[in-house]
Curated annotation (Swiss-Prot):
HAMAP family with a match to the protein in the record: Undec_diphosphatase (MF_01006)
Protein name: Undecaprenyl-diphosphatase
Pfam families with a match to the protein in the record: BacA
Phylogenetic lineage: Bacteria, Pseudomonadati, Pseudomonadota, Gammaproteobacteria, Enterobacterales
Domain of life: Bacteria
Topology in the lipid bilayer: Multi-pass membrane protein
GO molecular function: undecaprenyl-diphosphatase activity
Provenance organism: Buchnera aphidicola subsp. Acyrthosiphon pisum (strain APS) (Acyrthosiphon pisum symbiotic bacterium)
Subcellular location, record wording: Cell membrane
Family matches, as InterPro entries: UppP (IPR003824)
Amino acid sequence: MLDLHQVIVSIIIGVIEGITEFLPISSTGHMIIASHWLKIDNENTKILEIFIEFGSALSILYFFHKKILRILKFNINVKKTNTKNLHILLAILPTIFFGLLFYKKIKLLFNTYNVMYALILGGIFLLISEIFKPKKYKTCSINDISLLQSAIIGFFQIFCLYPGFSRSGATIGTAILLGIKRSVAIEFSFIISIPLIMGASFYDFINNMHNFKILDLPIFFIGFMISFIVSILCIKKLLKIINRTSLIFFGIYRFIISGLIYFIN
């Protein structure tokens, strides 16, 4: 029989992930905070979070699947090939490399205090991105993103390895500073998030298999489905919110949350 408390916790964490994944406020940071305040910060929770993050990644894949198929479609004429695979590789390889290299050390940062500092740093970065962005966009289509822009975005995406900084905040903020149109920056950010989130979820699961219990699978599945469904229901609306809202607003929100963490803890 399912434990009602575990079911409720799974639903809460799933909803949090489903909403925060698409905003530059750090979904991982919010899950860490929620786990701490719900007093469920244990090994079993880590497995639950892996399933939940995988659910949101699948929702992104579903939402952008037509765009992704066009990107990956082989074209004999290289000159006419849209956003090539190399652009995506350049944007994700730095995070993969440093994520694998410092995996154990990064996991030691998963606590509320480090999230608090990362929320502040990420908030400052969002403010800088919005204040110092070019007056005119240089890149107005995802197909026009250059290899150099992809590489720079990939470099700054490394900061997302610090829990609470926000992967989307790092990539969208960097892209906007590079003169990429906001809607294009958002689209590119979430397309490159798919292999990273799925890869990270798989690698985390492999490293935490010793904590996996088959009896807990229904709880994990509930979290997975809640995250997937909430993400599917919210993604279109939330992407519109990011596109129409100044990054300064999200920066201020991050400062408020970090302040709450400081005073409550």
